[in-house]
Structures are given as structure tokens and as C-alpha cells.
From Swiss-Prot:
Belongs to the lipoxygenase family. Manganese lipoxygenase subfamily. It comes from Gaeumannomyces avenae. Changing F347 to L/V: Changes the stereospecificity of the enzyme from 13R-HPODE to 9S-HPODE as end product from oxygenation of linoleic acid and to 9S- and 13R-HPOTrE from alpha-linolenic acid. PANTHER family: LIPOXYGENASE. GO terms for biological process: linoleic acid metabolic process; lipid oxidation. Lipoxygenase that metabolizes linoleic and alpha-linolenic acids to 11S- and 13R-hydroperoxy fatty acids. At the end of lipoxygenation, the intermediate product 11S-HPODE from linoleic acid is then transformed into 13R-HPODE as the final product. It also acts on alpha-linolenic acid producing 11S-HPOTrE and 13R-HPOTrE with subsequent transformation of 11S-HPOTrE to 13R-HPOTrE as final product. The keyword Manganese applies. This is Manganese lipoxygenase. InterPro entries: LipOase (IPR000907), LipOase_C (IPR013819), LipOase_C_sf (IPR036226).
């Protein structure tokens, strides 16, 4: 009985009390009966390092008890990192599910209501007769669930090759790589005269000059689409044009059936279909690759939870960043990736493929913690640095991410310095913090965190890196690919369908002229389109501003401000100021005299810290 009470106490810490009805308990994944009587103890009134705690014995006993009750369980939603189990782990999972349901309830109800209104409006206007009619999906609709609306230019410029290519440098930057002039081979050939006409040079010269880039979704060929739906497994070649200095598409290869290769010189509808097929693959990738942005911070937090006292300053910050984090896998398994669930209802490839994909990435070495540091990752793919080719003239994702991470890093540096004392060149305070060192050892040991800094942690810069990366994932990287991004950018129809509804062509010229017998045959019908937008709208979190849950609010929890002293409060004030400046610049974006924003014919705002939640929201 005592262990059950302790589990509930630990699970409730840092979370406001929630009244749980019996039906909620029954509906939330076998919530234990004792959780319905959860009481909440206050968060620590003072965060302190273990060596400064006057009650180290009780502190150590509390950690030992957590280790007994919070265990590493099997991975769920693909074979990646451990998911919590044990009495405390199960209670925390159930607690987070309830928090998630509470946060999502209004968004879900609003999106469903707006979906019904949108469908009624579309049908009253005669439905989709041309591609232009997809504007009926958005014009005047989704004002509450997606108050910022879809990206300016995403509809009006949807046939633009520059829009298509620049999405790789903004909405989905995690799959693009530059082909190294000597280390990478050309993935497929493109007819020489076509390359010459498009680029005024040769494919080999582009490669040798470091001007050739690849997105490879050929791995999707191993998955079988659902009945009545279809999918290619596209590879896309892109190039940096030496004349215009623009990043442009060169060719798309389908890798299925007769394996057609399309280029911008093809019939305009054939080429547009190729881009649609590519984007269908890309949407699958972004939605399932982002699962790693859940599992990586989860396992880092799990290791910390088993080794750090709740009174440790670092634990306080990590708990804040991991608000409701353990809801996503059980909720996803229950309603999104279950057979016939929301995924199967909307996407071409089945939920079984979606679950398999992140595990496949992880099995092939993906999901490394330090490898995911922003600049290290981008440099490894040749997107920054000039070792393998000329600099990209515009890289919207990196431009915004670099500034946001800079603000996070400044906060974390000040937080670490205020916690461990002014940095005088002696980082011995880190080595004396046995809880911190136990965390690093746990992460490298039982937790099996891939590519985590080695134990012992000797330099506070390493700790700053770790904390910065966790906060960047929860409040930045995740939202580039999920949260509000799909409904505003990467999932906007007609260019980004979740499923294709006609077979992949066996010859060019099969697209007609944009009538229902042409391109519309591959695209969702009116009801399917509304269902796609509704699902993606439910990923958005429109209320976080009113709830003080944005990235700007990440470190402003009252218990953290009260329990960490004036240095922490000053760091938070600086962070709020920095992110406010970033937010105002992003929110104020529009088109320049050339009709471009950050070099793109659409306005990208996915990293606005005053709009995004600070946590892993969905």
C-alpha cells in the first residue's frame, strides 16, 4: 500500500490536481484504481544540488524508491527507445494521457465542428471540379482551430517549382542531403539534354560542383498501400542553379511500376502529379520521422527521473519541458495507429507501415542524441558549411532554428551558471554533483540513450548542450514537422495529399487537363479532403497562447521561478525578451518586391515561439 501511495505522489508532482471520473479511468488505458484519488503535493519550494541539501538521507531514499517504481519497459509505436513501466511509470503515463485529453478537448471539438461546416460549404458550391476548387477547403474556414490560417502563397503559388523545392529547406529539412562530389554516387540518371536545358550544364558537373541534392523516399517501396490507395517511393534530385542562385527541382523518380522519371520539362500536369506523388511520400516521412522527437527526449528524461531528485534544479527544468510527454505513445496506439484508426482513414500506407518506419530508422543507427544537434546534423548532410559545395543562399529552417536555439542556449547557460556558480574555469562543481553524474551514467548504461555524452560529464558546456537540445526538440524541432505545421504547410491540399486514389502512371500523358478525369483522380474527394484537414487541424494547439503554454513561457513555471533564485528569474526574463523579438519578426513576414519571403513564394512561420507549445503536444 505504501508503494502505491508513493507512486501516486511522485506521478502527481509538478502537475495541477485533476478530478478524475470513473469513466475517465476506464477510458484511459487501464488507469489504476488508486489514481482516481490522486492528491498533489507541492513542488519543491527550493531547488538545490544534492551536496547542499540538509536532508540528503531522505533525498537519497526518495530516489531509490523512484528507481523501484519507475522502470524501463518495452518500446511502443515501433522499436525505438524504452517506454516507462512499473507502478510509477504506469501512473505517470495515465496522468499524462489525462492531461493530453484535457489540453486537446477544445481543439478536437472545434476542428470537428469546423469540418462539418466546411464540408457543407463545399458541397453547396458543387464540390471539386478543378484543382482551384481546393481553395474551398480553406477560404473562410478553420478560423478557430487554425487561427493563423494556412501559409500565404501555399495555394496561390502551389504549382511553383520554387515553392516545391524550398519546402525541403523549411517544412521538411530532415530528409534532404547534398550529394558529396566524391563520397556519394549519383542515385539515378537524367537525360543529358534535359539537364542541359534546365541547368545549362551537365549532371556530372552539378555533382562535382557540390550543387546537387537528394531526397530519397525509395525505402517506402517495401510498404504495401491500403486497398484502393496507391503510393510511389520517390527520389527527388534538386540543384543549386548557378545563374539564378535558386534552389530548384531537377527530377523525380517514382521507383514503382515502370519507374518513370519526371522533370520540369514534362507536360505541366505530368510534372505536377510527380510533385504530388513526391509530397505524399514526404508527408508520410515527416509524420513518422518526428516520432523520434518524442522518443529521444523521453528516454533522456526517464534516465534523469531514476537518478535525480525532484529537488534537483535540472530535474525541475526537464519535468517542465516534458509536460504530458508520456501521453503520445499510448494515445497514438489507441486512436491514431490502431487498425482502422485515424491514420488508416486518411493515409495511403497503413498504420503498420507507419509504426514500422521509426523503428527501421532507429535500427539503422538513427536517433542519436548528439548527432541530432542542429549544426552537427545539418553539417553532416552538407547543408551548412562549405566543405562540399557553395552555400545555400536561403535556408529558412536554419535561419529561424539558429536564432531560437541561440535564445534557448543563452537561457541554459545562465541557468547552469546560476546553479553551479560563476564559471571560473573550474567545472569541479559538476563532478561533485553525484546525482547529475549518476544521470549521465544511467543514460549511457541501463537507459541505452544512443550517442549521449559520455560519463563523467566534466564541462558545463556539455550540460548546456544537452539541456538546449532537449528544449529545442520539445519546443522547436517537433513543431517543424508536426503540431500546426502539417495543416498550415506540409499537408496543404491539393499539393500534399495523405493518400493517392489512382494507380501510379505507367506512362506519361495520363493526367488529362486538370479535370476530375485527370489530376483530380489521384486526389482525395471532398469528404476525404475535409477529413485530412480536420485530422491535421486537431494536431494544432490554438489555445497555448491563452494558457501561457508557448515556447516563450517554457521556463516561467511559478515553482521554477520561486525555487531557483534571482539568477534563474533573470535568465527567464532575457529568454522572454529574446523570443518575443523572434516572434515579432516571424509574425510580421510578408512578400518582398519579387513576391518572395526568405527566398520562397510562401510565408513560413512554423518556428514562431509565441504560437508553438513548449512541449511535445501531439
Amino acid at each position: 500500500m505504501r508503494s502505491r501511495i508513493l507512486a501516486i505522489v511522485f506521478a502527481a508532482r509538478h502537475v495541477a490536481a485533476l478530478p478524475l471520473a470513473a469513466e475517465d479511468a476506464a477510458a484511459t488505458l487501464s488507469l489504476t484504481s488508486s489514481a482516481s484519488s490522486t492528491t498533489v503535493l507541492p513542488s519543491p519550494t527550493q531547488y538545490t544540488l544534492p551536496n547542499n541539501d540538509p536532508n540528503q538521507g531522505a533525498r537519497n531514499a526518495s530516489i531509490a524508491r523512484k528507481r523501484e517504481l519507475f522502470l524501463y519497459g518495452p518500446s511502443t509505436l515501433g522499436q525505438t527507445t524504452f517506454y516507462p513501466t512499473g507502478e510509477l511509470g504506469n501512473n505517470i503515463s495515465a496522468r499524462d494521457v489525462l492531461l493530453w485529453r484535457q489540453d486537446a478537448a477544445n481543439q478536437t471539438a472545434t476542428a470537428y465542428r469546423e469540418a462539418n461546416e466546411t464540408f457543407a460549404d463545399i458541397t453547396s458550391r458543387g464540390g471539386f471540379k478543378t484543382l482551384d476548387d481546393f481553395a474551398l477547403l480553406y477560404n473562410g474556414h478553420w478560423k478557430e482551430s487554425v487561427p493563423e490560417g494556412i501559409s500565404k502563397g501555399m495555394l496561390s503559388n502551389c504549382t511553383s517549382d520554387l515553392l516545391f523545392s524550398m519546402e525541403r529547406l523549411s517544412s521538411n529539412p530532415y530528409v534532404l542531403k547534398r550529394l558529396h562530389p566524391t563520397k556519394d554516387k549519383l542515385p539515378f540518371s537524367v537525360e543529358s539534354k534535359v539537364v542541359k536545358k534546365l541547368t545549362a550544364t551537365t549532371l556530372e558537373a552539378l555533382h562535382k560542383g557540390g550543387r546537387l541534392f537528394l531526397v530519397d523516399h525509395s525505402y517506402q517501396k517495401k510498404y504495401t498501400p491500403q486497398p484502393g490507395r496507391y503510393a510511389a517511393a520517390c527520389q527527388g534530385l534538386f540543384y543549386l542553379d548557378a545563374r539564378s542562385n535558386q534552389f530548384l527541382p531537377l527530377a523525380i523518380k517514382t521507383n514503382v511500376g515502370v519507374d518513370l522519371t519526371y522533370t520540369p520539362l514534362d507536360d505541366k500536369d505530368d510534372w505536377l502529379l510527380a510533385k504530388i506523388m513526391f509530397n505524399n511520400n514526404d508527408l508520410f516521412y515527416s509524420q513518422m520521422y518526428h516520432v523520434l522527437f518524442h522518443t529521444i527526449p523521453e528516454i533522456v528524461h526517464e534516465a534523469a527521473f531514476r537518478t535525480l531528485s525532484d529537488r534537483h534544479p535540472v530535474m525541475g527544468v526537464l519535468n517542465r519541458l516534458m509536460y504530458q510527454a508520456y501521453a503520445i505513445r499510448p494515445v497514438g496506439g489507441a486512436v491514431l495507429f490502431n487498425p482502422g484508426g485515424f491514420w488508416d482513414q486518411n493515409f495511403g500506407l497503413p498504420a503498420s507501415a507507419a509504426i514500422d518506419f521509426p523503428g527501421s530508422v532507429y535500427a539503422q543507427g538513427g536517433g542519436g542524441f548528439q548527432a541530432g544537434y542542429l549544426e552537427k546534423d545539418l553539417r553532416s548532410r552538407g547543408l551548412i558549411g562549405e566543405d562540399s559545395g557553395p552555400r545555400l543562399p536561403h535556408f529558412p529552417f536554419y535561419e529561424d532554428a539558429h536564432r531560437l536555439i541561440g535564445a534557448i542556449r543563452r537561457f541554459m547557460q545562465a541557468f547552469v551558471d546560476s546553479t553551479y556558480g560563476a564559471d571560473d574555469g573550474d567545472d569541479g562543481a559538476l563532478l561533485r554533483d553525484y546525482e547529475l553524474q549518476n544521470w549521465i551514467a544511467e543514460a549511457n548504461g541501463p537507459a541505452q540513450v544512443r550517442d549521449f555524452p559520455a560519463a563523467p560529464l566534466r564541462r558545463r558546456a556539455q550540460l548546456v548542450d544537452v539541456l538546449t537540445h532537449v528544449a529545442w526538440i520539445t519546443g522547436g524541432a517537433h513543431h517543424v514537422m508536426n503540431q500546426g505545421s502539417p495543416v498550415k504547410f506540409s499537408g496543404v491540399l491539393p499539393l500534399h495529399p495523405a493518400a493517392l486514389y489512382a494507380p501510379i502512371p505507367t506512362a506519361k500523358g495520363a493526367t488529362g487537363n486538370g479535370t476530375r478525369a485527370g489530376l483530380l483522380a489521384w486526389l482525395p474527394n471532398e469528404r476525404q479532403a475535409v477529413e485530412q484537414v480536420s485530422l491535421l487541424a486537431r494536431f494544432n494547439r490554438a489555445q497555448v497562447g491563452d494558457r501561457k503554454q508557448t515556447v516563450r513561457d517554457a521556463f516561467a513555471a511559478p515553482d521554477l521561478l520561486a525555487g531557483n533564485g534571482p539568477g534563474y528569474a533573470a535568465a527567464n526574463a532575457r529568454f522572454v525578451e529574446d523570443t518575443g523579438r523572434i516572434s515579432r519578426e516571424i509574425a510580421g513576414r510578408g512578400f518582398d518586391g519579387k513576391g518572395l519571403s526568405q527566398g520562397m513564394p510562401f510565408v513560413w512561420t512554423a518556428l514562431n515561439p509565441a504560437v508553438n507549445p513548449f512541449f511535445l503536444s501531439v
